[in-house]
Amino acid sequence: MEFENNIPIYIQVINQIKKDIITGKLPMGAKLPSTRELAVLYHINPNTAGRVYKEMELQNMCYTKRGLGTFVTEDAAVFKALRESMAQEFISNFI
């Protein structure tokens, strides 16, 4: 993934994961990579990967089960809100 200089890396990674959730590549309830795996996958610092999951949890996009990992939210309302916000973002970028 190529990162843009004017947007923080953690936000760009969150946006990519949002796209994966919306398109079904990451279905609701799917297990996300560990923090270290995410860091390797995106070639980012493990602290940045940790921040990605922390911010996603604050936005209710995912949840963590101690000892089991981090999972995509199963809340349909959150999923719908993600789709709507991504659609709005796409429309505003297009116009």
For the regions a protein language model found, what residue spans apply to each?
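A generic structural signal for solvent-exposed, polar alpha-helical segments
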Residues: 9, 16, 48-51, 59, ...
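Extreme N-terminal segment that seeds HTH/winged-HTH DNA-binding domains in transcriptional regulators
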Residues: 1-31, 37, 41, 81-95
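Short glycine- and Lys/Arg-enriched binding-loop motifs that mark or flank ligand-binding interfaces
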Residues: 20, 25, 46, 63-65
